[in-house]
Swiss-Prot record:
One annotated Gene Ontology cellular component of this protein: cytosolic large ribosomal subunit
Keyword Ion transport part of the UniProt annotation: no
Keyword vocabulary terms for this entry: Ribonucleoprotein, Ribosomal protein
Signal peptide: none
PANTHER family per the UniProt record, alphabetical: 54S RIBOSOMAL PROTEIN L39, MITOCHONDRIAL, LARGE RIBOSOMAL SUBUNIT PROTEIN BL33M
Source organism: Sphingopyxis alaskensis (strain DSM 13593 / LMG 18877 / RB2256)
One record GO biological process: translation
Highest taxon, organism lineage: Bacteria
Name of this chain's protein: Large ribosomal subunit protein bL33
HAMAP family registered for this protein in UniProt: Ribosomal_bL33
Family designation: Belongs to the bacterial ribosomal protein bL33 family.
């Protein structure tokens, strides 16, 4: 079985609520850290989410 091309990453909220999303990314095409503006239900607004490793 071949190694998967995508890796799972965790998108952690910068609002310090502890909320996170889990998503996939292709490390060959996206070499830099991912930052996305998404909705944080604990803060009840759209905030920036930054990439972190899944432990």
């Amino acid at each position: 079985m071949a190694k998967p091309t995508t890796v799972k990453i965790k998108l952690v909220s910068t609002a310090d609520t502890g909320f996170f999303y889990v998503t996939k990314k292709n490390p060959r095409t996206m070499t830099e850290k991912m930052t996305v503006r998404k909705y944080d239900p604990r803060a009840r607004k759209h905030v920036e989410f930054k990439e972190a490793k899944i432990k």
